[in-house]
Amino acid sequence: MRVLAALIGKDAGLAAAILKTVNSPLFGLTRKAADIPQALAILGLRACTNLITGLLLRQAFPVGAGPLMQRYWDESTRAAEAAIAVTRLARGVGRDQAHTYTLFRNCGMAVMITRFPDYASIVEAHANAPGPELALAEEARYRFDHARVGYALARGWQLPEALCHTILLHHEIEQVATRTRAAAAADPALLAVGLLAEQVVRLRAGQALTGEWSAHEGFALQTLGIAPDAIIELVQAPALDPSPGSG
């Protein structure tokens, strides 16, 4: 712990980002962390490691790469924050795992934004159908989709296998829900958290629910042990309101 705290302390930007995240209302800590050693002591090694991984992802694909990357990060960050709120109501889902998975779920899109100049046009054309329809369009244009790219990135970063496979299959919900052999390594609870968190973000933005939610709402709610009425509670959660100076 002391060695990790010392390493983090050498990167002022990373240390500040960790403290800001840990002390946010989303984590609901009874006492605030004043420094990195305290943050590690309060959250534990695994939770801090997952948090750092997410922050490093942001450094790898900076917001300044353009408006589509800005939008990608806005949506991904809000979804990851909503995932933390979901875990407070759900059963059997770790807060840090849910946050990391939801932040990385669409990380393949960040790679494709930086790699393909025409990718923005494909995303815009499927703005109202951001799920399987977008993946099919990606497959037709590039011969792979963002889920496969995200899986490769997550494995390259040595994230847990269950998380990697859930990223790979996050648009193959029926496979995961029915526990097919191909989906055996994926985590249904993580998949459900990401799906619900996405809907919470959309509803808070005044957008319609996705087709994936309409098709798989029952799976998500049953897997998490959440009643439909709880979605309203999540949408209205004060902890998800932007903090002063955020953006």
Pin down the residues of each PLM region.
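Conserved alpha-helical "signature site"
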Residues: 1-120, 124-214, 240
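Terminal helices and disordered tails flanking the catalytic cores of nucleotide-processing hydrolases
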Residues: 185-189, 219-247
